Swiss-Prot record:
The RxLR-dEER motif acts to carry the protein into the host cell cytoplasm through binding to cell surface phosphatidylinositol-3-phosphate. The gene is RxLR61. Keywords: Host cytoplasm, Host nucleus, Secreted, Signal, Virulence. Belongs to the RxLR effector family. This is Secreted RxLR effector protein 61. The keyword Secreted applies. Effector that partially suppresses the tobacco programmed cell death induced by cell death-inducing proteins. It comes from the Eukaryota. Disulfide bonds: none annotated. GO terms for cellular component: extracellular region; host cell cytoplasm; host cell nucleus.
Length: 102
């Protein structure tokens, strides 16, 4: 199942794909501590300034080369990272379930 989150302030549309639980201990984690796959689409990244885009690229342990960018982090860490990368603070405004074949 996938979740589409909309960051209203920056009009960035990102897709969170729930990852399968790798270890039984993860089952006991709170929902917002689960690991998600974040995909930032090309058209959204182009709205960022070059300096912010470089800052995003500096997270080499998080980001593979090319598009779409992928981050593997618990949801609160993702929100903090996006707040650092984007202009000003980032607020994840809406979350809705969408059909997914994953």
């Amino acid at each position: 199942m996938a979740f589409q989150l909309r960051i209203v302030q920056h009009l960035l549309h990102i897709t969170f794909l729930r990852l399968p639980l790798a270890y039984p201990s993860q089952i006991h984690q709170r929902e917002n501590e689960r690991m998600f796959l974040l995909r930032i689409h090309r058209q959204d990244v182009q709205h960022l300034s070059h300096r912010r885009l470089r800052q995003l690229n500096e997270h080499r342990s998080l980001l593979p080369k090319g598009f779409p960018f992928k981050l593997l982090r618990p949801l609160p860490q993702l929100q903090r990272l996006l707040s650092q990368v984007c202009r000003g603070s980032v607020r994840i405004d809406a979350c809705c379930c969408i059909p997914s074949c994953h």
